[in-house]
Amino acid sequence: ATIVHMHVRDENGHLTNDITQFKRTISLIKDKCDILIEGSTGGVSELSVEERGFVISLPEVEISAINMGSVNLGEAAFVNEPEDIRIWAKMMQDYNVVPVVQCFEPGMLETVRVLKEEGVLKLPIIYGIPMGFVGSQPSCSVNMQYMVNLMPDNAVWYFQQHGMRDL
């Protein structure tokens, strides 16, 4: 499957939760491509938990990224508190959206395990492994292999490279 992971920005370049902007962007993409739309609860921003999660309710969103913890991205702290993660996971269940659990570092894979045990995360789950962000895990085969080794057998996962720095 081909997936587009999207964050929508307003005319000033700021992250937005404007439903009109999202629907317009999704329409422009779908007009040109047969592609899965991956929403996201992410984005370094001042949006509230509800504002960050609204994309999950859009019928065009079939899968959505959900970050499994907090991480520094460059000079910004990307805060994802455990209770917020639970709220978004429950929304995904309610709207039948498949979670893409974004694990920036090994401890976040443990969070996935715990949330599965609690019943907060249910299968199917897709694992996203973002690497190469300044302030996060560098991209290299050793780090990738370690992350894959920590995943459950038969896990569905993908790698996400930020920039060209580590390639």
Describe the role of every protein-language-model region:
Residues 1, 47-57, 166-167:
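Short, acidic/polar
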Residues 2-11, 37-40, 102:
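Short beta-strand segments at enzyme active-site cores
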Residues 3-25, 73, 130-131:
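Glycine-rich, proline-tolerant flexible connector loops at the mouths of alpha/beta enzymes
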Residues 14-15, 44-48:
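Acidic-and-aromatic substrate-binding clefts and catalytic sites of carbohydrate-active enzymes
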Residues 14-40, 87-94, 145-155:
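Alpha-helix-loop-beta-strand connector modules within alpha/beta enzyme cores
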Residues 16-33, 53-63, 114-128:
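Short, electropositive alpha-helical surface patch
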Residues 43-46, 70-72:
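A short acidic, glycine/proline-enriched capping/turn motif at secondary-structure boundaries
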Residues 61-167:
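Catalytic alpha/beta core domains of metabolic enzymes, predominantly
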